Amino acid sequence: MSYLAVSSFSLHKALGPLRLEMRREDGTLDDLLIDFPRTLTFEEFIGQARDTVGVKAVELCQLQFDSAVPERIEHLRAALDEAGMRMLTMPIDIGDLGHVNAAWRADDEARIKNWFTIAKQLGASYVRVNAGSPGSVVTQDAWAGLVASLRSLGDAANSMGLRLLVENHGGTSSSPEFLLPLQAAVGLDRLGILLDLGNFDPLVGISHARFTNTDVEDTGIDLEPMYAAIARLAPHATLIHAKSVDPARDGTPLPDLPRALSIVAASGYTGSISIEWEGRLGDPWERTCAIAATVRQQFPHLQ
């Protein structure tokens, strides 16, 4: 069964700090928090996604968890069950599997696998990791290590009844010429592709700049390569992120979501789609509902 889901990142302005990390040259890890107020709990988000958007599934992002202690996870699973909702995906944003340091990668793998256990406890179908770190460039000398790490994680996910995904998430990973050979090297049985309809240059750079309140030129840009990349990856996608951000100053939609979704539909895709509103303007629930209506026009079969 295929679902329309809402990502918790769509409510990033309300669900509290984003918890990232940075590894120093000596290997120690520092927490990196992007501060947002917590005016909504995960439990409240789940209920509102059902009642406001009319979906039956959610995506809960690891970097938005306020706690991962067993009692917290049990309470969250109970909230999902009570609401009649399922957790579709857990995007996991820790580690750098594209680093050449094997010991660091091994540590990252172990910590990622701990989140696999949490995802399984919450009933997730998919876990998404990064092919490197978001926006990074994976060098040729890091390729073998990245493939080995993803094979290990893919086997671990399979053993838990989960499906491992990587996403076009900026940098090298936003190139089909990188993602498709990577999937082939890791093995289609171990690794799927999460196609994010907005995470291609130049849009991913615009989105990240806005997120850090950096002024960036967003008018007159050529988005045709982005739609070509969507067409290249859509036949290989396991899951879709219906991404949308605030329009350009001249009103150009970023992206043209009906066009992007029509490309996906033309590829024969019939799987699940998760809504990810990444804009800063307007009411996020209203924006998410608008995206949901657009998705359902192209994919009316989604639960």
Description of each model-found segment:
Residues 18-20, 57-58, 90, 150-262:
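Acidic/histidine-rich catalytic cores of soluble enzymes
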Residues 119-139, 160, 165-173:
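Active-site groove signature of glycoside hydrolases
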Residues 272-280:
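Short acidic/histidine-rich active-site segments
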Residues 54-55, 119, 124, 237, ...:
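A structural motif
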Residues 10-12, 62-64, 93-96, 131-135, ...:
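Active-site-proximal loop/turn and secondary-structure-junction residues that shape catalytic pockets
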Residues 42, 73, 108-115, 143-146, ...:
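Aromatic/hydrophobic pocket-lining residues that form the small-molecule binding cavity
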Residues 1-121, 188, 192, 209, ...:
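N-terminal pre-domain/capping segments
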Residues 85, 162, 267-271:
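A short helix->loop->beta-strand "cap" motif at the edges of active sites that frequently abuts
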